[in-house]
């Protein structure tokens, strides 16, 4: 049988439910501008009915508020994270490609390639007109030095930019580690509360906001799995395992545990590309597991930074091991056949450092030099490698894949470094080959006009090696050792311009200019300098077209993903965000419900007053 005060109890549950909804609405309104806040709503259900001794059998007992839940759609969360990942990647590319474009753009305030190159050949034209005049030779040598300084400066700019990107990569790794730690801590706090079958909404908001931040840095996958009270059971314990994966499924956070990444600087012997800056970071898991830095599934700002720093347009050293021979000193000679691709068979395009790491399948061995043999197809490279303690015997990799570095399908800093190196090698060789046919004013054979300076010793490399047989050693004095960063004018000519020869025969007189005439043709003659089908003076057009294309692509994708991001974000906010107008309607609605339940209580009170006070019950 129902209590005498049954109706009053029912009205009280209505007041409680309306009050809970009013408080939830008030909380939503208070957090309308809180970043990451998810709109909440109180869930109410009818209370369990009560059996009574009446013909209708059971009577309702009012209402119960079961939960205060977040209004959230996981589908749009995933879409938002994907949009953030893509936006982060192209935003980084656009930012740095505009910087590279700025380096190569001729400005009114700073002379670029075209005016410097033109000035050099203008001064050479003056030598042609007045071959016996010392001042014209001095002016030409100075103009040639200006061209060298231009490339030196560009190489330095790209190296500094590469180091800047490298530092930004470290910052992003630190951010990932910090976010991982915070998520693991929040997982524990959330489970501590929710094991009592409560809902830690605010803590969940903090965690979701961290995932939002992480998704822009790197691609992210989230999985939340309930834990049941018994294995194979159906009753949930209230605890969940929250797992976060990045970079194509690599575990970052698993429940209360998290993994961290660390940046390990490459040593000078571990360079991947010849012109790479020293100390570029490899990223590894702190538990010694490899982090798949170049995986196709990597995304976000980290991917954009990696592609800018390491992008080689897929032009990297790779081939198949032909033979592995042990030496008496404990080293090994590994001969590798390479595909018939010009960036592997033309030493002007090759980017191998003198020493570095050769990867046989998945094992890295240090090499201290290499030899190239291009006399037959396929061309071969022979490396001298060292086997460290614990490493596999290299002979087991006979016939297996070999590589230095890895392919990165983007025209990043290494690509533009290689393009400059290739041009200065072709151009310097063309000029030097002509100049070496001349004699100076004393009748002595002229030396090369352009040289390379050793980075450490500062010694000049004058390219004395003979590559007529298309063979090369990394220790040879050849144009492969010439880069945009070390090209210079022969110091002997800088000191004494008379060392610059203008004729093949001094007997022709001081005004003889047959060599000068040939040198002048280098700027236009594609038979002497052919850079990607262009003449020497068209170098900048080739480079800037690449940069402009990459920069415009990055800009277009950034704009597209910005629009997608905004669209998904708006849809997401329409579901989980707080709308002032909607909450204002809820206030009126729940106030009315509260008033009605209160009115019921008032009426029931009057009934009980009459029943108790006036009937003498």
Pin down the residues of each PLM region.
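Structural signature of extracellular appendage/secretion-system components
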Residues: 1-617
């Amino acid at each position: 049988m129902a209590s005498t005060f049954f109706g009053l109890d029912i009205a009280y549950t209505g007041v409680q439910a309306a009050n809970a909804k009013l408080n939830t609405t008030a909380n939503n309104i208070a957090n309308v501008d809180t970043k990451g806040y998810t709109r909440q709503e109180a869930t109410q259900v009818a209370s369990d009915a009560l059996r009574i001794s009446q013909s209708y059998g059971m009577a309702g007992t009012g209402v119960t508020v079961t939960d205060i839940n977040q209004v959230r759609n996981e589908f749009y969360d995933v879409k938002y994270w994907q949009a953030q990942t893509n936006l982060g990647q192209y935003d980084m590319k656009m930012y740095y490609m505009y910087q590279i474009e700025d380096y190569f753009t001729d400005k009114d305030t700073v002379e670029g390639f075209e005016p410097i190159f033109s000035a050099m050949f203008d001064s050479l034209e003056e030598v042609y007109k007045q071959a016996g005049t010392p001042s014209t030779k001095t002016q030409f040598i100075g103009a040639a030095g200006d061209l060298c300084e231009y490339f030196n400066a560009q190489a330095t700019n790209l190296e500094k930019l590469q180091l800047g990107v490298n530092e930004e990569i470290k910052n992003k790794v630190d951010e990932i580690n910090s976010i991982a730690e915070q998520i693991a801590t929040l997982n524990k706090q959330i489970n501590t509360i929710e094991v009592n079958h409560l809902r830690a909404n605010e803590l969940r908001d903090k965690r979701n906001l961290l995932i939002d931040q992480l998704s822009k840095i790197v691609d992210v996958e989230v999985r939340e799995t309930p834990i049941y009270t018994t294995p194979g059971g159906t009753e949930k314990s209230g605890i969940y395992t929250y797992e976060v994966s990045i970079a194509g499924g690599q575990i970052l956070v698993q429940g209360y545990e998290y993994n961290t990444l660390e940046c390990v600087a490459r040593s000078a012997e571990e360079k991947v590309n010849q012109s790479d800056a020293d100390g570029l970071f490899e990223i590894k898991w702190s538990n010694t597991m490899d982090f798949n830095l170049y995986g196709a599934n990597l995304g976000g700002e980290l991917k954009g930074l990696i592609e800018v720093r390491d992008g080689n347009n897929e032009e990297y050293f790779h081939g198949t091991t032909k033979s592995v021979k042990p030496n008496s000193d404990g080293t090994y000679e590994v001969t590798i056949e390479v595909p018939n691709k010009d960036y592997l068979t033309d030493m002007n395009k090759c980017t191998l450092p003198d020493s570095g790491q050769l990867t046989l399948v998945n094992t890295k061995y240090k090499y201290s030099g290499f030899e190239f043999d291009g006399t037959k197809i396929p061309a071969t490279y022979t490396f001298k490698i060292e086997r460290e303690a614990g490493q596999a015997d290299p002979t087991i990799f006979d016939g297996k894949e070999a590589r230095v570095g890895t392919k990165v399908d983007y025209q990043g800093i290494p690509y533009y470094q290689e393009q400059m190196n290739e041009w200065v090698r072709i151009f310097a060789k063309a000029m030097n080959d002509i100049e070496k046919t001349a004699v100076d004013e004393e009748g002595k054979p002229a030396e090369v006009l352009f040289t390379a300076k050793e980075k450490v010793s500062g010694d000049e490399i004058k390219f004395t090696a003979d590559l007529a047989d298309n063979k090369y050693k990394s220790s040879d004095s050849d144009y492969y050792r010439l880069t945009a960063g070390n090209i210079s004018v022969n110091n002997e000519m800088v000191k004494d311009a008379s060392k610059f020869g203008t004729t093949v025969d001094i007997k022709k007189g001081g005004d003889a200019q047959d060599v000068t005439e040939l040198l002048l043709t280098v700027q236009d003659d594609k038979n002497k300098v052919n850079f990607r089908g262009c003449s020497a003076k068209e170098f900048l057009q080739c480079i800037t077209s690449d940069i402009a294309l990459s920069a415009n692509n990055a800009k277009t994708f950034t704009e597209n993903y910005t629009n997608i991001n905004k669209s998904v974000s708006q849809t997401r906010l329409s579901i989980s965000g707080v709308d002032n107008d909607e909450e204002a309607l809820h206030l009126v609605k729940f106030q009315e419900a509260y008033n009605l339940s209160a009115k019921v209580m008032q009426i029931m009170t009057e009934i009980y007053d009459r029943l108790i006070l006036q009937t003498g019950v």
